[in-house]
A protein has these predicted regions:
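TPR/TPR-like (Sel1-like) alpha-helical repeat modules
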Residues: 234-252, 259-263
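Short helix-capping/linker turns of helical repeat alpha-solenoids
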Residues: 2-3, 18, 31-34, 47-49, ...
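Hydrophobic face of amphipathic alpha-helices that form TPR/SEL1-like repeat modules
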Residues: 7-14, 40-47, 76-83, 112-119, ...
Length: 305
C-alpha cells in the first residue's frame, strides 16, 4: 500500500516542477488522511489556483487538516466561522479554532484571537488579552496585528491607552510598508496624538499611503488638507478633485463630505447615486488577512512537511 506521506512528498515535488499531475497525487494523499496534503489541497481549492475555486470542498478539507493539527487549516476554519461565509457565523467556534492555531504560533490566528477579545466576539471583552495576542502576532512581523495593537492603545475605552506607544507602532508598520500604517501615522500627526501636531508630516504620510496602494482614506484626508491649506498649498480645486476620486472609489467619509458641500450649494453633484452611503458597522480595527494564505501564487503558500 502506498504510504500517504511519500505520496505527499512526490506530489509536492511534481507541483514544484510545474507538473499538474502532482495535483492528483496530492488529492490521493489527502484522501488517505495526510493532514499536510489535506491542508494544501484545501488551499488550492480555496484560492482557485490550478483548479476552479471550490470553497465548499475547501472547507471540508480545512476541517480534516485542522483536526489533524495543521495550524493554517485551523485558522482558515476559524475564519469561516468568524465571517460566516460557508457556515452560519459562530464566534465561539471561531474562537476555539483561532486559539488552537494561535497557541501553535500562527500569527494570523493570534491576530484574530486578539480581535475576538477586543470586540467581545465569542468571549467576554478583555483588552489585556487582546493586547497580549496582538503583541505576539506583531512580534512575528504580522503588520495587521501591529496596526490593531496601536489602535488598541489609541482606544479611549482601553484603561491602558498610550498614544505615544500607538504612534511608535504606527510608525513601525509604515516603515515596514503597510499602507494602513501610513494612514494611521498621518492621523497621529494631523491630530497631534502621541506626537506634536505636524501638518507637513501628515500630508507626507497620506501621500505615501496613496502611492503604495491608492488608499482612499489617505486620498480623502490629503484632499481635505488641500482644501484647508494644511501642510500643503491651499488649492480648492485639487482638494475637491481628490475627495471626489475617493468618493467614487467608495470612501464613505468622502461621500458624506461631498453631500455636506452639495447641501450648502458649494458644489454640484454629478451623479447622486455615487454618493449613496452604505450601512456598515465594520470596526476600523479589523483589517484583511494579510499573509494568511491568500491567492499569492500556488507555490508560495503550499506547506511542506
Amino acid at each position: 500500500m502506498t504510504d500517504p506521506s511519500n505520496l505527499f512528498d512526490t506530489a509536492m515535488e511534481a507541483l514544484g516542477n510545474g507538473d499538474i499531475d502532482g495535483l492528483d497525487l496530492l488529492r490521493k494523499s489527502a484522501e488517505m488522511g495526510n493532514a499536510y496534503a489535506q491542508n494544501n489541497y484545501a488551499m488550492i481549492l480555496y484560492s482557485g489556483d490550478l483548479v476552479d475555486k471550490d470553497p465548499e470542498s475547501a472547507f471540508g478539507w480545512f476541517r480534516s487538516a485542522a483536526e489533524g493539527g495543521i495550524d493554517e487549516s485551523q485558522f482558515h476554519l476559524g475564519l469561516e466561522y468568524y465571517e460566516g461565509n460557508m457556515v452560519d457565523r459562530d464566534y465561539r467556534e471561531a474562537l476555539k479554532w483561532f486559539r488552537v492555531a494561535a497557541e501553535q504560533g500562527y500569527p494570523a490566528a493570534q491576530y484574530y484571537l486578539g480581535l475576538c477579545y477586543y470586540h467581545g466576539n465569542g468571549v467576554f471583552r478583555d483588552y489585556g488579552f487582546a493586547v497580549r495576542w496582538f503583541t505576539l502576532a506583531s512580534d512575528r512581523g504580522y503588520s495587521p496585528a501591529t496596526i490593531a495593537l496601536a489602535d488598541a492603545y489609541m482606544d479611549l475605552k482601553n484603561p491602558d491607552r498610550n498614544y505615544k506607544e500607538a504612534f511608535r507602532l504606527y510608525r513601525n508598520a509604515s516603515e515596514a510598508g503597510d499602507e494602513r500604517g501610513y494612514y494611521k501615522l498621518g492621523n497621529c500627526y494631523y491630530k497631534g496624538k502621541g506626537t506634536p501636531r505636524n501638518f507637513i508630516e501628515a500630508s507626507k504620510c497620506y501621500r505615501k499611503g496613496m502611492e503604495i496602494s491608492k488608499d482612499t482614506d489617505c486620498q480623502y484626508m490629503l484632499g481635505i488638507m488641500y482644501i484647508k491649506g494644511e501642510g500643503v498649498p491651499k488649492n480648492h480645486k485639487i482638494g475637491i478633485s481628490m475627495v471626489r476620486d475617493a468618493a467614487k472609489e467608495g470612501n464613505e467619509e468622502a461621500k458624506a463630505y461631498l453631500m455636506r458641500l452639495a447641501g450648502q450649494n458649494i458644489i454640484d453633484i454629478e451623479d447622486p447615486a455615487e454618493l449613496m452611503l452604505e450601512d456598515t458597522n465594520t470596526p476600523d480595527i479589523i483589517g484583511g488577512v494579510k499573509g494568511a494564505g491568500g491567492n499569492k501564487g500556488i507555490f508560495s503558500f503550499l506547506r511542506r512537511r
